[in-house]
Amino acid sequence: MTALKNDRFLRALLKQPVDVTPIWMMRQAGRYLPEYRATRAKAGDFVSLMKNPELACEVTIQPLDRYPQLDAAILFSDILTIPDAMGQGLYFETGEGPRFKKAVGSLADIEALPVPDPEKDLGYVMDAVRTIRRELNGRVPLIGFSGSPWTLATYMVEGGSSKDFRKSKAMLYDNPQAMHALLDKLAQSVTAYLNGQILAGAQAVQIFDSWGGALSAAAYQEFSLAYMKKIVDGLIREHDGRRVPVILFTKGGGLWLESMADSGAEALGLDWTCDIGSARARVGSKVALQGNMDPAVLYAKPAAIRAEVARILAAYGAGSGHVFNLGHGITPEVDPAHAGAFFEAVHELSAAYHR
């Protein structure tokens, strides 16, 4: 594989010295970019775009072409590829978000689910990873990702998005045996899927636990974090002569950073409700931190964006171990020029913290 020209992102995850704080952005390939909207229109719809390796590669690289400051590319895909490959039948309703043709309701449903083979059942994702790595040609590292078992389980049990997770939580409390069976199968599937991405060329991986923060403290430990730890334990940690860092991101997980720091992951993603300085004090030197600007700051003028970047950099303080990001994905209505101002501010203002 081609040597990396910019490994700042990987170095920061391993708390090695960097010249400036690296930056990437969740959903950096997304609807706020006119070029993304044009490619999506060419594909016809989101699922067709995601399942076409050439077009998925095109949209992955678009933000890097527009913003030379970006220090990583993230695979263009969706967290729901695994349930789709298990036969749930993913589709998107306009204005409704993701739906499944089949929901999971019983232990029998769960026992019937296959563990997808990454190359056979999710080959379009592996092909996209290979295509993107080839096209990047060492420009920046490529991040692979998956949803967490708990987050995937909520979609599978609810049959799509949910505001209150009533079916998933009812199963968790009424029938913990069934929920554990589902989470165990999903943990096996996510481990195989992320290892497939690593073998295909992903140089770091992130586990998105979007709905872990909806759980009680006790339920989070038992039904979310325990399964993410299981995944981390089963991942390929060295590939292509380099460490493959793992980032755990639980939205709403700020209360549980200490136990997340014991997961074996190299880094924790933070949402914007955490103070990054106190998060750093709490986790010590165990893990790097990623985040954590409120995505809504990007609606403000560039001077306000710059001020918030300065505040977060000062809160983290000097030294490596910080990857700048938003606290969640960028929203579609943001002006692309504001994203550019954000990236420029991070590199420019962070240099002083790395001397």
From Swiss-Prot:
Catalysis performed (reactions): uroporphyrinogen III + 4 H(+) = coproporphyrinogen III + 4 CO2
Feature type site, description Transition state stabilizer: D78
Bilayer-spanning residue ranges: none
GO CC entries: cytosol
Gene3D superfamilies according to UniProt: 3.20.20.210
EC number: 4.1.1.37
GO function terms (MF aspect): uroporphyrinogen decarboxylase activity
GO biological process, any: protoporphyrinogen IX biosynthetic process from glutamate
Binding-site list for substrate: R27, Q28, A29, G30, R31, D78, Y155, S210, H328
InterPro entries: UROD/MetE-like_sf, Uroporphyrinogen_deCO2ase_HemE, Uroporphyrinogen_deCOase
Chief location of this protein within or outside the cell: cytoplasm
Pathway: Porphyrin-containing compound metabolism; protoporphyrin-IX biosynthesis; coproporphyrinogen-III from 5-aminolevulinate: step 4/4
Cross-referenced PROSITE patterns: UROD_1, UROD_2
Top enzyme class: lyase
Domain of life from the UniProt record: Bacteria
Cell compartment(s), UniProt: Cytoplasm
Keywords: Cytoplasm, Decarboxylase, Lyase, Porphyrin biosynthesis
HAMAP family: URO_D (MF_00218)
Family: Belongs to the uroporphyrinogen decarboxylase family.
Function text: Catalyzes the decarboxylation of four acetate groups of uroporphyrinogen-III to yield coproporphyrinogen-III.
Subunit annotation: Homodimer.
Entry protein name: Uroporphyrinogen decarboxylase
